[in-house]
Amino acid sequence: MSKNIIFIINIVKDERSKNQGYNYSIKSWEHYSKKINADLFVLDKPLYDFSYMKPQWYKMYILDILEVNEVKYDQVLYVDADTIIHPNAPNIFEITDNKFCAIRNFGCMDWVCRSLENYSKLLFEDFIFPYYNYFNSGVMVFNKKHKEFFKSIQEFYQEQHERIKHVQDNYHVGNDQPVLNFFVNRDIPKDYKVLDYEWNMQDLTRFEVLGEDMLHTKYGYISHYNAGVKPTPGYWLEKTYKHLYEN
């Protein structure tokens, strides 16, 4: 019997990643998976040497990983390991319309625009799309019909990984996220559904809503501790988990 899958990549690369509190993220998603009758899949082993491919790119292989492991699935929710899901969150799989779903990127707009400009010029033959269509790849929903779409990105990486690394090293722009955005906006724009910010509350520090009183947790479903939250993402992952699940 097929089920919906929640997929997390939790690869320990160094001491920093070991001590980021990602276990609290996983625990929150364990609660959610049971609530909505989904299966949780945590990838904790590298697919490639880090010198060739960073773990962020493993998102493009999720459907292949599930098939290799003989996991039957309907839809897949991918989430970054620096997220906490609210215990009152409804079933995200019921609002997707069977499309590729993501949440627009909020904040870091200079970085977004520079990523668009440089990837467009150096890797996508001047194809460009509006910056306000750019999404954060830390929360995405997709399904079986997107297998060929992800396959095309895998092939692109295999052919262009040296140029991609050059762009990242010399222009200090995004990693997998800009490439994924270009493919979605170029190849499947009509199959792309934007979900509300409450499903990926990102860049909380710059929005000045991240505080010790945890007020932000009342206004959304997924807290995403990206974009350099202080003192560390691990601090907020632990604090948020205990606030939502242990109080």
Indicate residue ranges for each PLM-predicted region.
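N-terminal anchoring/stem segment of glycosyltransferases
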Residues: 1-61, 65-73, 189, 226-229, ...
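Conserved beta-strand termini and adjacent loop/short-helix elements that scaffold enzyme active sites
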Residues: 9, 43-45, 103, 195-198
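Short, polar loop motifs at secondary-structure junctions
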Residues: 26-27, 85-90, 198-200
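A short acidic, often aromatic-flanked loop/helix-cap motif at beta-alpha or helix-coil junctions
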Residues: 46-51, 108-110, 200-205, 230-231
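GT-A fold catalytic core of metal-dependent nucleotide-sugar glycosyltransferases
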Residues: 55-117, 141-142, 146, 150
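Charged, low-complexity C-terminal accessory regions
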Residues: 82-94, 219, 224-247
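Short, flexible, basic/aromatic active-site loop/helix in glycosyltransferases
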Residues: 117-131, 148
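Catalytic core and acceptor-binding pocket of nucleotide-sugar-dependent glycosyltransferases
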Residues: 132-235
